[in-house]
Amino acid sequence: MEVTNKKSPTPVELIDWLNDEGVIELDWDFPEDGDLVAAGLDSLAIVRLVAAVEDRFEVELGVDDLTRAHLATPTTLAALISVKTA
């Protein structure tokens, strides 16, 4: 599924997009508040995530953005992207 809005992806769009980009493999019914780290978001996946997010949403993610709080769930990640694109 393509993210339709570069400015504020929904958590559901983000789940599909993360799968499509090969960042992390999530089940089709992965919850919006599901734990991404428990689902397999490891350090290598974070590197892929940063590159994909920066490219797709035309933002820069700094070290301060790469916290457990920001990367915990599709909802928190969508919120981070929304703030960065505002």
Label for each model-derived stretch:
Residues 2-27, 79-86:
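Thiotemplate assembly-line natural product biosynthesis machinery
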Residues 45:
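Two-component histidine kinase catalytic core, primarily the HATPase_c
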Residues 20-38, 58-65:
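Phosphopantetheine carrier-protein modules
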Residues 65-76:
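AMP-binding/adenylate-forming catalytic domain of the ANL superfamily
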